[in-house]
Amino acid sequence: MTNSTSDFVGVLEADLNGQDLRIGIVQARFNEDHCVALTSACINELLSLGVTQSDIKLVTVPGALEISFALQKMAETGEFDGLIALGAVIRGETYHFELVSNESAASITRISIDSGLPIANGVLTCDTDEQANARVQVKGAECAQAVVEMANLALALTPDIDIEINASEEE
């Protein structure tokens, strides 16, 4: 007889219902064609998951290194259940590609951990424009799915503050 882990522990299943979630998107404008395609695919997927257009806020920034500043400011507002970073870094002839790729990824992760807010990283790092073109549709949709799933997970794992307040009032 084979037992699954759900026979022994409580399992929080992936929840891709975006209804009532408030999602912020930060899109870089550098390599704009790729970024606009990423954003379009992402928003279309968010809508298909039940996030309403009025619950999606999009801001644009000059490039990938500026994404983290906007994410930080959006996280500080407390208005969002999840954030999405979208951009495209294409390798050139200098070390700049590695710097931008590494720093943008590290800062996005740091903001997510420090703020406790899920952030889907959709900053493409590709060698060529062709590679970026091949990835924009899938990556944009994957970021939407990831942020909805992680926002729902965060909400499910967050204690209900009202219950705690009511319980302490009854004492």
From Swiss-Prot:
(2S)-2-hydroxy-3-oxobutyl phosphate binds at residues 93-94, 135. 5-amino-6-(D-ribitylamino)uracil binds at residues 30, 64-66, 88-90, 121. Keywords: Riboflavin biosynthesis, Transferase. The keyword Chaperone does not apply. Pathway: Cofactor biosynthesis; riboflavin biosynthesis; riboflavin from 2-hydroxy-3-oxobutyl phosphate and 5-amino-6-(D-ribitylamino)uracil: step 1/2. It catalyses: (2S)-2-hydroxy-3-oxobutyl phosphate + 5-amino-6-(D-ribitylamino)uracil = 6,7-dimethyl-8-(1-D-ribityl)lumazine + phosphate + 2 H2O + H(+). The active site is at 96 (proton donor). This is 6,7-dimethyl-8-ribityllumazine synthase. The gene is ribH.
